[in-house]
């Protein structure tokens, strides 16, 4: 997910997507531990997307404090 697409979402949508990603990450890690999935690419991309969302949420939080 591109940063601009993430910035277009409101705070509630971002938090909802983060919860969904957490659940997906848990399932993917479980599948990897069971040997059902080999590729790390999807896990890495999800981790980067999650970090991007957290960063944008934090930016908004800090911008709100400055005002």
UniProtKB/Swiss-Prot annotation:
Entry keyword annotation includes Lyase: no
Record-linked NCBIfam families: L29
Single annotated GO MF: structural constituent of ribosome
Stored Gene3D superfamilies: 1.10.287.310
Keyword Ribonucleoprotein among record annotations: yes
Chain ranges passing through the membrane: none
UniProt similarity note: Belongs to the universal ribosomal protein uL29 family.
Gene coding for it: rpmC
Gene Ontology biological process terms in this record: translation
UniProt protein name: Large ribosomal subunit protein uL29
Gene Ontology cellular-component annotations: ribonucleoprotein complex; ribosome
Top-level taxonomy: Bacteria, Pseudomonadati, Acidobacteriota, Terriglobia, Bryobacterales
UniProt KW keywords: Ribonucleoprotein, Ribosomal protein
Pfam families reported for this sequence: Ribosomal_L29
């Amino acid at each position: 997910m591109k940063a601009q697409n993430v910035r277009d979402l409101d705070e509630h949508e971002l938090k909802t997507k983060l919860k969904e990603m957490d659940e997906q990450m848990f399932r993917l890690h479980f599948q990897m531990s069971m040997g059902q999935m080999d590729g790390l690419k999807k896990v890495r991309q999800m981790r980067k997307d999650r970090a991007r969302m957290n960063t944008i949420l934090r930016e908004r939080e800090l911008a709100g404090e400055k005002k």
